[in-house]
């Protein structure tokens, strides 16, 4: 199959995040490219507001995989900033507790969306018959996509550090080196996800959808919560 270089170049004012994906021209790697583009756009969209209470303007049709990817990265962006806020040493304890509970709910919502992405893949591959020697991956495709979403946020924020005019040259240089590593990681992860999807489609690997057991949110499995009910 003919190989190609797919380039996405984004800047803070227009589009942002620089990544080069070396892959093959097939539908699976096009999906990975779509993830990168949507995550980059959504990260930028959040930072137009830079407010954890902002209401997103989702441009995608409800129920589509694009819609799920947008909502996934939006939740990640909001939670990123909630984690920043809760680490303020001067935060009011009452506010911190409320925020911690909000973060717990966000984690559950995030997990639910990841499982929605895995359900999409499971339905996509339902007619694929795995080969006799097919193997399973250490993580499902959606949890790898989850890491790709977080990487988009890391790259954005590290790029902001590189652009700071109030920082020392040493800080800018250090962050520039970290940014280069993050971009390399994004390229490698994108390639790995594409290869995993190709292997699943070819029956070389198979996947399972494990429903995550968030025990701390469940009144039946969190001992502190179920003790209250006795």
Protein language model features and the residues they cover:
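Cationic, amphipathic, low-complexity segments that mediate targeting or membrane/lipid association
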Residues: 2-5
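Short, positively charged and aromatic/hydrophobic N-terminal segments
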Residues: 7, 13-16, 20
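Residues marking helix boundaries in flexible regions
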Residues: 21-22, 28
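Anionic, Ser/Thr-rich low-complexity intrinsically disordered regions
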Residues: 28-230
């Amino acid at each position: 199959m003919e190989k190609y270089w797919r380039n996405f170049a984004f800047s803070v004012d227009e589009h942002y995040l620089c990544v080069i994906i070396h892959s093959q021209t097939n539908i699976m790697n096009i999906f990975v490219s779509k993830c990168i583009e949507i995550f980059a756009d959504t990260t930028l969209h959040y930072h137009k507001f830079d407010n954890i209470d902002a209401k997103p303007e989702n441009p995608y049709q409800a129920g589509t995989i694009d819609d799920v990817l947008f909502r996934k990265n939006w939740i990640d962006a909001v939670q990123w900033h909630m984690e920043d806020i809760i680490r303020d040493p001067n935060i009011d304890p009452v506010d911190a507790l409320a925020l911690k509970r909000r973060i717990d709910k966000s984690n559950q919502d995030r997990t639910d969306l990841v499982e929605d992405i895995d359900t999409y893949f499971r339905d996509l591959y339902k007619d694929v018959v795995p080969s006799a020697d097919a193997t399973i991956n250490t993580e499902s495709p959606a949890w790898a996509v989850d890491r790709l979403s977080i990487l988009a946020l890391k790259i954005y924020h590290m790029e902001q550090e590189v652009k700071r005019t109030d920082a020392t040259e040493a800080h800018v240089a250090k962050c520039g080196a970290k940014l280069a590593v993050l971009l390399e990681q994004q390229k490698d992860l994108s390639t790995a996800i594409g290869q995993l999807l190709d292997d699943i489609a070819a029956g070389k690997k198979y996947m399972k959808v494990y429903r995550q057991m968030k025990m701390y949110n469940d009144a039946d499995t969190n001992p502190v919560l179920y003790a209250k009910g006795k």
